[in-house]
From Swiss-Prot:
HAMAP family: RNApol_bact_RpoC (MF_01322). Transmembrane segments: none annotated. This is DNA-directed RNA polymerase subunit beta'. It catalyses: RNA(n) + a ribonucleoside 5'-triphosphate = RNA(n+1) + diphosphate. It is an enzyme of class 2 (transferase). DNA-dependent RNA polymerase catalyzes the transcription of DNA into RNA using the four ribonucleoside triphosphates as substrates. The gene is rpoC. The keyword Zinc applies. It comes from Campylobacter jejuni subsp. jejuni serotype O:23/36 (strain 81-176). Zn(2+) 1 binds at residues 71, 73, 86, 89. The lineage of its organism: Bacteria, Pseudomonadati, Campylobacterota, Epsilonproteobacteria, Campylobacterales.
Length: 1517
């Protein structure tokens, strides 16, 4: 860093050009130099004259005059005496503002400790002296002595225990030692003075060296910790002047004795005001009371000392002085808070700056501004996109100064006074001038809560009558505004720069896209959607159907003359082609720009289609075209919604006729289940789950039935159906509550009540049903209130951690990236690869899997078209650049960030991407929370998965899969992990019989086949192959990766497939549970109907080696018999448009070289209609099966002790159920003793039902027991927000799973201290040991192979573990997919890059493992930037650099650990941050946003980046 000069700030100066801000401890001399005089008296003002008392807390002589340029006695008045000191009253004539900056001081008779350095952990004074905080307090509060000079003193008579320097003694010990060793130089004292002397005598450099030696000498971790604590404080003191200029007097480092106060500074009086209220009372700032007590006690102490009072009285007075100063600095930190007259604690200096009402957050980060007003909003449908209606009354006030100037300029008024009078009388000239002033002067509108940047937008005002602001209907979505009484604030930009920014950057017509997702935010909603939907509908047999019209004018004439219905199907010419459309759609076409293709408008337009249309117009046409198009769309929508005259009537709500039948059927099923529960055939959990499933499916059937009826009603013109179908208002779920049945409800705790509400709202609810309904409704409202606060807090934390992230350079030049693929949860796709790659820059070439040529080169920016090509090419994973891998020194580079979603272009340097990201994640947080009650508390849980089935075609490969055959001859999965069933298609087939060989060379894998005569080699890229841990489902995804079914040295037949492409995979544990039944064989083909997907000519091929050979004799009706059969669809230029693999047993539906047109044509068909089921299992229970034949014995399973007996009444069978709560140390276990000494143990979880008896003989794969899965809870969004904040806070979960750190084989060792010991042994001989609590359920078996990152026990994976074991890229994948699951599950689209920006901030600190020669200490958390700079400095000097490991900090910790002092202090834990910074003399280089806002400077992003540089604007030709 460069050296800085310290600026002396003059009294009235407002320096703009300072570059840094440093916090330091103030020396007593410094405090004196600030002071303008000593405050000697506790008086404030004279109650009669109301003038400040001399030498008092408000003294004018010390602090300056009360009135501008006027001394207290009135001898000197006016400017011309500036700087004169009055002889009579001693007041200097000056501006009264100096009372805000001039300080005084109080000379304390005895040094007093500053409470921040005593009481905030770790206690700085205590640490330096090596004294415990409690002991230090006893010394300071005169309860104990501290040894200043031990002399030759010993504690015991035998002289073995020596008295050490800084030992703390009680009264008795002190008297004892004094008697015996007074002459040997023993000396101990108590109180502030001795502590100050001890601190003054410290030689920090010597102490530092001594501590370093001790550190090197010790082996105990605990000792190391305490030494490191002391080292940190000592180093902070020594380094506290590193950046000061050596020639200035500021270069002295902080001294420890400055933590003791001898001169107490007094705050300028105007910062602790005393205001006269009417009625002769005064409102006083609490600080004055606290100062008064200090002064009183100080003067009393002075008097007592002059009188030579007894020691005990003086001590008491000194203690009281210490307490008074403590209270002034931080009241209530120690002991009880000092209370004022009204029995509430006084607000001390610390309280004034911290918290929401403190100086930082209340007055510095957010200020009230002038030229603003607020009013209620109403809709302004006639406005243009960039206009708002401003009430004349408001405009008159807001633009008053402009208006006064205008009136004078026009000559209507000669003086300001006259102009003011005109405005008061509201003459005609005033209105005329107001129109002119307002023209071309934009205003900003803001709706609280301001959750993202679109909550403040600029508009051109249009003056309107009335008192309400008019708002354009399309910008409501961005503001989240509606017209039920919302209010908005208006702000007037004043400077020319501000006005220019409003016009160029903030106009609402410029902000069409959401920065969170890049989707358009100005999409028509509600009435507008309804109107456009109505207009685009088609009605069979409407008036004038099948007519031919030349164009829109003819259609309009026909409509006017009533010979054509708006919904009639007509034919017309568009772009030289004859098309069939409707009259209404032609009207829509007439407002569209010419470049919109027919398939975008010639269909029924629902809300999603309209949104897609707006997006398309924006992408193709740009801002101006889109803005005017949106206005036309809005007008059209409103017009036809009005003309349609859609209304709601009770006749629109149609109840299905067979509702009662369905309900009776469901009730019958429920009775059956209840009976089988009573007979003991199923557990209570199963009963509950099954009943809920029955009612769910009944509800679904009824809803579907009802929707069909409503849809058919009035030929699709049923009002309610139109509203829901168009997306204008309501949903199918809500209609089904109106017309089918209300369904299952939830209790306030989120569990589902098993009796549903059978009535619907049309029939009406009975009393019980109504009562159950209220639960859900009430819960929704309560949740909303609670969660809004949480979401707001999350946003604040995110903003704080990300505020300093901005785009600094174009390209950081890194080649590193992160591999991404689609995010899936279970079997549903959460986010496709196409969505994830949009707007990102590639970090590696993308290779086309079919042609093996480079599809896109490294460094390509993926726009919509490229992303689409990529999506269609069948590529499953891509390497992209991300903020996490960016190597820019500060901030992020544009290439690693990608497209700025708000503009759709590559981001420019200076963009505040951190803030945008935080807003994008936080804003839907509040949305999520506010959305709970819309479904009225009706329950929603997905039907539980009972099976997996193949969605694609290919053939089956078992990876590591072992199965058992049970008595029924079924195949049962025997693996618990590290196995999978893959669906593959062949990529390379063997040209001849031979031996396979596989070798790894650098980035390539070479597969070769060899027989006696010949050898062929195939080269594959290493990262295209699926890794073992990916196949096992530990990390990453395997779709599209390559799989090698054979190992080196195996013999392979001719035409066998040796390299395969994985199309789908189901790994054991995550997708296929243990003990599932497998319904496919290894190598079995899976046949689906294959659709063409493109139009063109069919060509059939067969795979030979790694190339395709043409097969021409294929006819319709052939059955494929051979592996490796492909069909290619060639387009008109004979290029390959699409390629499909056709598995064996498929039936070909076309001849070779035949032309096909439609994309949905089936080329090859499957013999069976339904999808191929891969595996099935019990949906309600986890099954435990026997792994060997043998005899069962029970351990710790005893009826009435650890288990309960249940008797089945019908059959008389007894079964044991493990109790839910077990005594400690009791672990119910089933043991199977097999042949020889083979034994297998099964530890049982609570609630497990046991199906065997002690001593039973059993066979392999028999069912031993079942554990019910947890009862289904309704998915409320609560999972959402707390989950997101848990991830961002990187909290260690309560029930964290123990994770394997290395790949290897599991071994169980002897239990240690009632904990299980698991050892993992790797192939290379390393091993890792884990001790696991007995309460945890272990999920691995002895002898199993496990991958790093897999869970050993049940529980939640902690993100810290992911980072530690699998590294930063795996953490990136984990956090993003977890967070996206929450948001996508709620239908909220957020681009990954926003989450990545936050994650990169959570990883911005590293933990020093080895300090080398640097100034760091091991265990330090330092920012990567500081770490890098320090290492570079040490390397330049030829020293050892430090080594560090990455750490993941939660957003709160990361924000407090900010490099900027001001920013950290204004976030949380203000006192702690300031204490630390002052000792270390920390610098704040004012690089980020927050600290500049606080100091009132331009923020260094966007246009503020160019700050003081003079910009020249030139007009475009």
């Amino acid at each position: 860093m460069s050296k800085f000069k310290v600026i002396e700030i003059k009294e009235d100066a407002r320096p703009r050009d300072f570059e840094a801000f440093q916090l330091r401890l103030a020396s007593p001399e410094k405090i004196k130099s600030w002071s303008y005089g000593e405050v000697k008296k506790p008086e404030t003002i004279n109650y009669r004259t109301l003038k400040p008392e001399r030498d008092g807390l408000f003294c004018a002589k010390i602090f300056g005059p009360i009135r501008d340029y006027e001394c207290l006695c009135g001898k000197y008045k006016k400017m011309r005496f500036k700087g004169v000191k009055c002889e009579k009253c001693g007041v200097e004539v000056a501006n009264s503002k100096v009372r805000r900056s001039r300080m005084g001081h109080i000379e304390l008779v005895t040094p007093v400790a500053h409470i921040w350095y005593v009481n905030s952990l770790p206690s700085r004074i205590g640490t330096l002296l090596g004294v415990k905080m409690k002991d230090l307090e006893r010394v300071l509060y005169y309860e104990a002595y501290i040894v200043e000079n031990p002399g030759d003193a010993f504690y015991d008579n035998e002289s073995t225990k020596k008295v050490e320097y800084c030992d703390v003694l009680n009264e008795e010990q002190y008297q004892n030692l004094m008697q015996r060793y007074e002459n040997s130089g023993f000396k101990a004292r108590m109180g502030g003075e001795v502590v100050r002397d001890l601190l003054a005598n410290l030689d920090l450099v010597a102490l530092l060296n001594q501590l370093k030696e001790e550190m090197a000498a010790t082996n105990s971790e605990a000792k190391k910790k305490t030494i490191i604590k002391r080292l940190k404080v000592v180093e902070n003191f020594l380094n506290s002047n590193l950046n000061a200029n050596t020639d200035s007097d500021e270069a002295v480092p902080n001294r420890p004795e400055w933590m003791m106060i001898t001169n107490l500074p007094v705050l300028p009086p105007d910062l602790r005001p005393l205001v006269a209220l009417d009625g002769g009372k005064f409102a006083v700032s609490d600080v004055n009371d606290l100062y008064r007590r200090v002064i009183n006690r100080n003067t009393r102490l002075k008097k007592l000392m002059e009188l030579d009072a007894p020691e005990i009285i003086i001590r008491n007075e000194k203690r009281m002085l210490q307490e008074a100063v403590d209270a002034l600095f931080d009241n209530g930190r120690r002991a009880n808070a000092v209370k004022g007259a009204n029995k509430r604690p006084l607000k001390s200096l610390s309280e004034i700056i911290k918290g929401k009402q403190g100086r930082f957050r209340q007055n510095l980060l957010g200020k009230r501004v002038d030229f603003s007003g607020r009013s209620v909003i109403v809709v302004g449908p006639k406005l243009r996109m960039d206009q708002c209606g401003l009430p004349k009354k408001m405009a008159l006030e807001l633009f008053k100064p402009h208006l006064l100037a205008k009136l004078e300029e026009k000559g209507y008024a000669t003086t300001v006074k006259q102009a003011k009078k005109m405005i008061e009388n509201k003459t005609n000239e005033v209105w005329e001038c107001l129109e002119e002033v307002v023209k071309g002067h934009p205003v900003m509108l803001n709706r609280a809560p301001t959750l993202h940047k679109l909550s403040i937008q600029a508009f051109h005002p249009v003056l309107v009558e009335g008192k309400a602001i008019q708002l354009h209907p399309l910008v409501c979505a961005a503001f989240n505004a509606d017209f039920d009484g919302d209010q908005m604030a208006v702000h007037v930009p004043l400077s020319q720069e501000a006005i220019a920014e409003c016009k160029v950057l903030m106009l609402s017509s410029m902000n069409i896209l959401l920065p969170a997702s890049g989707k358009s935010v100005t999409v028509p909603s509600q009435d507008m959607v309804l109107g456009i939907y109505y207009l685009s509908l088609e009605k069979a047999g409407a008036k004038g159907s099948h007519k031919i019209c030349t164009g829109i004018d003819e259609v309009m004439m026909a409509l006017e003359s009533k010979c054509l219905d708006i919904h009639a199907s007509i034919q017309t010419m568009v772009d030289g082609r004859k098309i069939t459309t409707t009259a209404g759609r032609l009207i829509i076409k007439s407002i569209l720009p010419d470049f919109v293709p027919e398939n975008s408008w010639n269909k029924v337009l629902k809300k999603k289609d309209i949104a897609a249309l707006v997006d398309y117009v924006y992408k193709q046409g740009g801002l101006e075209i889109t803005a005017s198009f949106l206005d036309r769309l809005k007008n059209l929508g409103f017009e036809y919604a009005t003309k349609a005259g859609i209304s709601i009537s009770i006749a629109d709500i149609i109840v299905p006729n067979d509702k009662q039948k369905a309900i009776d059927e469901a009730k019958k099923q429920v009775r059956e289940i209840q009976n089988s529960y009573n007979l003991g055939l199923i557990t209570s959990g199963e009963r509950y789950n099954k009943i809920i499933d029955i009612w769910k499916s009944t509800n679904n059937v009824l809803s579907k039935e009802m929707m069909k009826l409503v849809e058919k009603d009035k030929e699709g013109f049923n009002s309610i159906y139109m509203m829901a179908d168009s997306g204008a208002r309501g949903s199918a779920a809500q209609i089904s509550q109106l017309a089918a049945m209300r369904g299952l409800m939830t209790k306030p705790d989120g569990s589902i009540i098993e009796t549903p509400i059978i009535s619907n709202f049309r029939e009406g609810l009975n009393v019980l049903e109504y009562f159950i309904s209220t639960h859900g409704a009430r819960k929704g409202l309560a949740d909303t209130a609670l969660k809004t606060a949480n979401a707001g807090y999350l946003t604040r934390k995110l903003i704080d951690v990300a505020q300093n992230v901005k785009i600094t350079i174009e390209d950081c030049g890194t080649h590193e990236g992160v591999e991404i693929n689609e995010i899936t949860a279970d079997s549903s796709i959460i986010e496709t690869l196409e969505e994830r790659i949009l707007g990102r820059v590639l970090a590696e070439d993308v290779i086309d899997p079919i042609t093996n040529s480079v599809l896109f080169a490294e460094g390509t920016l993926m726009d919509e078209e490229k992303a689409k090509i990529l999506g269609e090419s069948g590529i499953k994973s891509v390497n992209i650049r991300t903020p996490i891998t960016c190597k820019a020194k500060k901030g992020i580079c544009a290439k690693c960030y990608g497209i700025n979603l708000g503009e759709g272009k590559l981001v420019k340097p200076g963009e505040a991407v951190g803030i945008v990201s935080a807003q994008s994640i936080g804003e839907p947080g509040t949305q999520l929370t506010l959305r709970t009650f819309h479904s009225g508390g009706t329950a929603s849980t997905d039907l539980q998965d009972r099976q997996v089935s193949a969605q694609k075609e290919g053939f089956i490969r078992f990876y590591n899969l072992k199965t058992y055959k049970n008595k029924e001859g079924k195949n049962i999965v025997a693996n618990r992990r590290n196995a999978a069933i893959l669906l593959v298609e062949p990529k390379i087939k063997t040209p001849f019989k031979g031996v396979i060989n596989i070798e790894n060379i650098h980035e390539d894998v070479i597969v070769s086949i060899k027989d006696k005569k010949q050898e062929v080699k195939y080269i594959l890229r290493k990262y295209d192959l699926a890794k073992p841990n990916e196949l096992a489902g530990v990390s990453g995804s395997i779709d599209g990766k390559l799989y090698l079914p054979y190992q080196s040295g195996m013999q392979v037949e001719e035409n066998e497939s040796i390299v395969e492409v994985i199309k789908e995979g189901w790994n054991v544990l995550n997708r296929i549970p243990f003990a599932s039944e497998i319904l496919v064989e290894d190598g079995e083909p899976v046949v689906q109907n294959i659709k063409a997907g493109e139009k063109g000519t069919l060509k059939f091929y067969i795979l030979k080696g790694d190339g395709l050979d043409r097969v021409k004799n294929v006819k319709k009706g052939d059955i494929v018999k051979e592996k490796g059969f492909f069909v290619v669809i060639a387009d008109e230029n004979d290029r390959e448009a699409k390629r499909h693999y056709i598995p064996r047993e498929s039936k070909i539906e076309f001849n070779d070289s035949e032309k096909i047109d439609d994309a949905n044509t089936i080329i090859a068909s499957a013999p069976k209609k339904e999808r191929k089921v891969i595996a099935e299992w019990d949906a309600y229970n986890n099954t435990i099966i026997a792994e060997i034949d043998g005899v069962v014995s029970f351990e710790d399973i005893e009826a009435g002790y650890s288990a309960d007996e249940q008797i089945d009444e019908a059959t008389g069978k007894r079964s044991l159920v493990i109790n839910e709560y077990l005594p400690s140390g009791v672990r119910p276990t089933l043991v199977i003793a097999g042949k020889g000494d083979k034994a297998v143990r099964y530890q049982l979880e609570p609630k497990t039902v046991i199906f065997v008896h002690d001593g039973d003989k059993i066979a392999q794969a028999d069912i031993l027991a079942k554990t019910p899965k947890a009862a289904a809870k309704s998915k409320d969004i609560t999972g959402g927000l707390p989950r997101v904040s848990e991830l961002f806070e990187a909290r260690k979960p309560k029930n964290a799973a123990v994770i394997a750190e290395i790949d290897g084989v599991v071994r169980f060792d002897k239990p240690l201290r009632s904990k299980e010991r698991i050892i993992i042994q790797a192939e290379d001989g390393t091993s890792a040991e884990y001790l696991i609590d007995k309460s945890k359920h272990i999920q691995v078996r002895d002898g199993e192979f496990i991958h790093a990152g897999e869970k050993l026990t049940d529980g939640v994976v902690s993100s810290h573990d992911v980072l530690k074991i699998l590294g930063e890229k795996a953490l990136h994948y984990y956090l993003i997919s977890e967070i996206q699951q929450v948001y996508r599950g709620q239908g909220v689209v957020i681009s990954d890059k926003h989450i990545e920006v936050i994650v990169s901030q959570m990883l911005r600190q590293v933990k020093v493992v080895d300090s080398g020669h640097t100034k760091f200490i091991e265990g330090d958390l330092v920012s990567r930037r500081k770490f890098r700079e320090e290492n570079e400095r040490i390397i330049r000097m030829g020293g050892e650099p430090a080594i560090a490991e990455p750490v993941l900090l939660g957003v709160t910790r990361a924000a407090i650990g900010s490099d900027s002092v001001i920013s950290a202090a204004s976030f949380q834990e203000t006192t702690k941050v300031l204490t630390e910074a002052s000792i270390a003399g920390k610098f704040d280089y004012l690089e980020d946003l927050k600290e500049n806002v606080i100091l009132g400077r331009m923020i260094p992003v966007g246009t503020g980046l160019y700050g003081e540089q003079n910009l020249k604007l030139k007009e475009q030709e």
